[in-house]
């Protein structure tokens, strides 16, 4: 019964703020999980800034993002180099005041490196207000596993894990700040290679898990992950079903 009540209250809040017009951009602080198809783009809208946690996907709601963020300082946090997490940089408006607060680890293709080089590094990243860890380096490989190099960030109770696989989860999920997470953005869009039992055991205070994915084409979130989340009695929301998800 407690789970049902928690889900109902949270659903009401989501419906309320999902209907909030973007013209009220100065009314409150909130976070938006954008419906970008298969990919990830989450924006924390604040009084004088927008913080973007990955900027990738199959499509981008540029008009809505512009309404909220074009007149503010934009901080970009990139978990790793995969295109469905960084692709928005290719069309990023040059007129916006923007900097990279967290670049991906290591190097990538010449094209991606050149694209990232267009942006200045942030001088003020407000590190005390967000936490990150760098997964163990994988040694000298010709083709490193970029998913395993995903950087993990918690901001305002929301846990962003990039495409971090189960093996890497076992390393960073023991950090002391992980259990305080209230919202989990599913790793690797809900792939069966992420969101382990160990991680869910470590995040018992979760109010909701969110899948930024497209099941119709990619079968994410995977049925095994959905079942795992259900066993832990964590409500699961999907951008494919809800559209943009607003969190206050």
Regions found by a protein language model. Give the residues of each.
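Short, conserved loop/helix-junction motifs that constitute active-site signature segments
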Residues: 69-71, 92-96, 176-180, 199-206, ...
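Catalytic cores of nucleophile-dependent amide-cleaving enzymes
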Residues: 181-199, 205-209, 213-218
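Core dinuclear metal-dependent hydrolase active-site scaffold
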Residues: 2-75, 118-186, 241-248
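Solvent-exposed loop/turn segments at secondary-structure junctions
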Residues: 38, 57-60, 81-85, 106-108, ...
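Di-metal (Zn2+ and/or Mg2+/Mn2+) metal-binding site signature of metallo-dependent hydrolases
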Residues: 71-96, 105-106, 188-198
């Amino acid at each position: 019964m407690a789970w049902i009540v928690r889900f109902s209250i949270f659903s009401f809040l989501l419906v309320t703020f999902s209907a909030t017009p973007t013209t009220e951009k100065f009314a409150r602080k909130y976070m938006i999980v954008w419906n970008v198809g298969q990919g990830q783009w989450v924006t924390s809208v604040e009084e004088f800034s927008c913080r973007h946690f990955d900027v990738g996907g199959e499509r981008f709601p540029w008009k809505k993002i512009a309404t909220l963020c074009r007149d503010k300082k934009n901080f970009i946090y990139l978990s790793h180099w995969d295109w469905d997490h960084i692709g928005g940089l290719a069309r990023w408006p040059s007129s916006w005041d923007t900097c990279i607060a967290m670049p991906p680890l290591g190097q990538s293709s010449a094209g991606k490196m050149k694209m990232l080089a267009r942006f200045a590094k942030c001088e003020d990243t407000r590190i005390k207000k967000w936490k990150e860890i760098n997964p163990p380096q994988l040694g000298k490989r010709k083709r490193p596993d970029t998913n395993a190099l995903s950087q993990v960030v918690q901001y305002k109770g929301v846990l962003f894990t990039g495409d971090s696989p189960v093996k890497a989860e076992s390393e960073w999920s023991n950090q002391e700040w992980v259990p305080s997470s209230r919202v989990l953005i599913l790793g690797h869009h809900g792939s069966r290679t992420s969101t382990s039992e160990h991680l869910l055991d470590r995040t018992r205070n979760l109010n909701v898990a969110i899948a930024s994915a497209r099941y119709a084409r990619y079968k994410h979130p995977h049925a095994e992950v959905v079942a795992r989340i259900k066993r832990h009695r964590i409500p699961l929301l999907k951008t494919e079903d809800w559209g943009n998800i607003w969190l206050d």
